[in-house]
Amino acid sequence: MAVHKEVSFVAYLLIVLGMFLYVDALGCTKECGNLGFGICPRSEGSPTNPICINCCSGYKGCNYYSAFGDLICQGESDPKNPKACPLNCDTNIAYSRCPRSEGKSLIYPTGCTTCCTGYKGCYYFGTNGKFVCEGESDEPKPYMSTA
C-alpha cells in the first residue's frame, strides 16, 4: 500500500511540475504593444542588383560583398544605437549576407507586436524612436511547396 502512495505522490508532483512548465511555455500574452517600428537586419541585394550602402551604415552582424563575392567589410552600425554615418553608397558593395535572410527589414506599422511576439534578431523601437527591446520569438519558417 505504501508503494501506491509513493507512486501517487510522485505522479502528482509530475503533474503539478508539468502544469508549471506548460504555463511557462504558453509564452506571450494577447495584449498589443506600443511599438513604433522594428528593424530586422536582412540579407539584401545581389551581384546583378546591388544595394546602396556603406560599411559605416551597414548593420553589425552582416557581411558586405562585392559583385565578385569578395568580402568588403562587416557592418559597423548597431540597430539599437546607430552610428552617424555618411549617406553615400560604396560602389564596391553589391550585396549583404546577414544571419536572417527572409522577411522585411523594416516593420512599420508593428500592429499588435510586443517584445514577446517580436522575432529574435529584430530590434523594436517606441513611437519616440528609442530602443525598447529585441524580439523574443522564433520567426516561422516560410512555407515550402514540395510539388
Curated annotation (Swiss-Prot):
S-S pairs: C28-C116, C32-C112, C40-C122, C52-C89, C55-C73, C56-C85, C62-C98, C115-C133
Keywords, in A-Z order: Disulfide bond, Protease inhibitor, Repeat, Serine protease inhibitor, Signal
Keyword presence, Protein transport: no
InterPro entries: Prot_inh_I20, Protease_inhibitor_I20
Sequence repeats: 25-82, 83-142
GO molecular function, one term: serine-type endopeptidase inhibitor activity
Highest taxon of source: Eukaryota
One family name in Pfam for this protein: Prot_inhib_II
Signal peptide: 1-25
Induction, per UniProt: Not induced by wounding.
Annotated site, Reactive bond for chymotrypsin, chain positions: L87, N88
Site (Reactive bond for trypsin): K30, E31
Family label: Belongs to the protease inhibitor I20 (potato type II proteinase inhibitor) family.
Role: Inhibitor of trypsin and chymotrypsin.
Name of the protein in question: Proteinase inhibitor type-2 T
